[in-house]
Amino acid sequence: MELQEVLHMNGGEGEASYAKNSSFNQLVLAKVKPVLEQCVRELLRANLPNINKCIKVADLGCASGPNTLLTVWDTVQSIDKVKQEMKNELERPTIQVFLTDLFQNDFNSVFMLLPSFYRKLEKENGRKIGSCLIAAMPGSFHGRLFPEESMHFLHSSYSLQFLSQVPSGLVTELGITANKRSIYSSKASPPPVQKAYLDQFTKDFTTFLRMRSEELLSRGRMLLTCICKGDECDGPNTMDLLEMAINDLVAEGRLGEEKLDSFNVPIYTASVEEVKCMVEEEGSFEILYLQTFKLRYDAGFSIDDDCQVRSHSPVYSDEHARAAHVASLIRSVYEPILASHFGEAIIPDIFHRFATNAAKVIRLGKGFYNNLIISLAKKPEKSDI
């Protein structure tokens, strides 16, 4: 089975769907919103071609569920707010939004949300039907998606960590698995495995930047949010917990060791310095803004979450419920690729053990994602300067 056929979130509206388990990602979007607004402000002041008539925007790796249109909503609100600040509120441009993800993404569930979204946009923003046009653009952002120099603003959140393929070189010439008992490039992975994953990410991210530079107009903007490497205080990440859960099942004889050793998730969490260096080396973009922030991976469990507090406060007294919440989110993201390799029957057991391990981490006040926000501008051609 092709990787692109299984590298997608759980679709639909069921209990295991991404749509029902994406409250964490709503918090990420809320943290990014002020940066998004500033990015839009700089974009509109750059006076790019045709920008006062039609702003062309894309969300790269849009997934499905309510968060998909929340990103669009935040972008439209930012554009209208900045236009009003510029005393151009009577000249609001048409906004054309492209939602992009792999072909197996549940675009249909997003389309079902559009009528109510358009009504809300008209009621709260005064934008009549037709002033914001939303379309799907299925495909991989590791290749070209749009015509040359056609886009003003590109956005991507929590997608860039996914690789275009499992790195090569994870099996030796003798057929021995180099990444035994691991499912990704963890701290325990041998140096050759870590290098293979870094090399694949470097290739993919560099290609991503080159493709986007071809699609963006000169001085167009791009806003990226992704998970980045944290520190020891953050505790094990969710991929570590998933790896532990699968190893538990191997130890119990529920899964064969060879099944674990042949499974490698195409995901890489880069460091801030790695991302920064790759942007600079590719050369098409100027870094305008770079910031990191931490979120507990059980953030979003309740609306009262103080998602950045590091403590043993009473918020951790319900660690089992919080751990189950985290397990549901991770299941909604990784179930398709796990089921394609291990089979559907074992999935509930994997995430039962995942939740057990996550509860131990949460009880200790650990379990954080380190996040990177980076705002980029396409460098102008010499003829544009």
Swiss-Prot record:
Site description Involved in substrate discrimination, residues in chain: 155, 267, 344
Organism domain of life: Eukaryota
Cofactor(s) required, per the database record: Mg(2+)
Metabolic or biological pathway: Alkaloid biosynthesis
Any one Pfam family match given in the protein's UniProt record, by short name: Methyltransf_7
Cofactor binding comment, as recorded: Binds 1 Mg(2+) ion per subunit.
Tissue and organ distribution: Expressed in roots, stems, young and old leaves.
Gene Ontology MF terms in the entry: metal ion binding; methyltransferase activity
Family the UniProt entry places it in: Belongs to the methyltransferase superfamily. Type-7 methyltransferase family.
Protein name as catalogued: Probable caffeine synthase 4
Organism annotation: Coffea arabica
Biological classification of the source: Eukaryota, Viridiplantae, Streptophyta, Embryophyta, Tracheophyta
